[in-house]
A protein has these predicted regions:
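N-terminal glycine-rich FAD/FM-binding segment characteristic of electron-transfer flavoproteins
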Residues: 1-256
Length: 256
C-alpha cells in the first residue's frame, strides 16, 4: 500500500506570539518551528499501516526551505521518501490554494491512501484535506480515531469517526481515499539515531511552485486579543446587592 502523508510546519507552541508590521501574519523570523501535532499523529498512523501491510510512506510538505526540517524528521521516524513543494507563499496560504498545490504534487503518485492531520495548529481551518480529496476525486472521511485495513483483498478500509456528544461512527470506504486524523489516535514514536542517519540517504523530491500563485483568501488583520477589565461596585443592602449580582451574572455575563 502506498500512503502519502501531508505535513505542515508550524511555529512552536511555546513561542511568544508577535504580529508582523503588515498585521497579516505572525513575525516568524526568529521563531522556532515544529511538525504540526495532528500531522504527527497522521504520520504515525501511516507508519503503523505500512508495518501491517507493507508498501511505502511518502511525506509531503509545502513551504520555504525551512520545511525540510519536518520532512527530514518524518524520514527519520520511518517515512520512505519525501516531496517538498518549495514556495515561500504556501506557508501561510489558504486551504484551497494549499490543497491545489498538494493535490497536483500527489496526483502522479497515485497513492492508495492520503492522511492529513485534522487541522493545523496555526490556522485551524480543518479544510485542506477535504478540499484535496475533492480535487483528486476520491472519497474522504474526517476526525478519524481508528483505521482498519481490509484483509479480504477488496481494497477497502474501515474507519472509526469521532462525532459530537461522545458518539462514534464506523464507515467502510473504498480506496483510494483521504482521511483526516484526530490527535491522540496513537502513541507517537521518536526518531532513533539509526533512523536519523538513514534519513540522510532518503530521497527528497523538490517540486517548484509557480511564485505568481495568489491565495483566494485575504486576511484583513491579525492581532493579539485585547483584554479589558471592568470593575463594578454594587451598592445597597446585602439582599439588594445579592439580587443585583445574580441579575448581572444571569443577564449580562450569562454564566448562570
Amino acid at each position: 500500500m502506498k500512503i502519502a502523508v501531508c505535513i505542515k510546519q508550524v511555529v512552536t507552541r511555546d513561542w511568544p506570539l508577535r504580529v508582523d508590521d503588515t498585521e497579516h501574519w505572525v513575525r516568524d523570523v526568529d521563531a522556532g518551528f515544529e511538525m504540526n501535532e495532528p500531522d504527527a499523529y497522521a504520520l504515525e498512523e501511516a507508519l503503523r499501516l505500512k508495518e501491517q501491510s507493507g508498501g511505502e510512506v511518502i511525506a509531503c510538505s509545502a513551504g520555504p526551505t525551512r520545511v525540510l526540517q519536518v520532512l527530514r524528521e518524518a524520514l527519520a521516524r520511518g517515512a520512505d521518501r519525501a516531496i517538498h513543494l518549495e514556495s515561500d507563499s504556501l506557508a501561510a496560504a489558504d486551504s484551497l490554494t494549499l490543497a491545489q498545490a498538494l493535490a497536483a504534487a500527489l496526483r502522479p503518485e497515485e497513492p492508495d491512501l492520503i492522511l492529513t492531520g485534522l487541522q493545523s495548529d496555526d490556522q485551524g481551518f480543518g479544510q485542506t484535506g477535504v478540499v484535496m480529496a475533492e480535487l483528486l476525486g476520491i472519497s474522504h472521511s474526517t476526525i478519524i480515531m481508528e483505521v482498519r485495513l481490509d484483509l479480504n483483498g477488496k481494497g477497502e478500509i474501515r474507519v472509526k469517526r469521532e462525532l459530537e456528544g461522545g458518539w462514534f461512527q464506523w464507515v467502510t470506504m473504498a480506496t483510494p481515499a483521504l482521511l483526516t486524523i484526530q490527535s491522540g489516535i496513537n502513541q507517537l514514536r521518536y526518531a532513533t539515531l539509526k533512523g536519523i542517519m538513514a534519513a540522510k540517504k532518503k530521497e527528497i523530491l523538490k517540486v517548484a511552485i509557480d511564485s505568481s500563485v495568489e491565495s483566494t483568501q485575504a486576511i484583513s488583520r491579525i492581532y493579539v486579543p485585547e483584554k479589558e477589565k471592568k470593575t463594578r461596585f454594587i451598592e445597597g443592602t446585602p439582599s439588594q446587592a445579592a439580587e443585583e449580582l445574580v441579575r448581572v451574572l444571569r443577564d449580562e455575563a450569562r454564566v448562570v
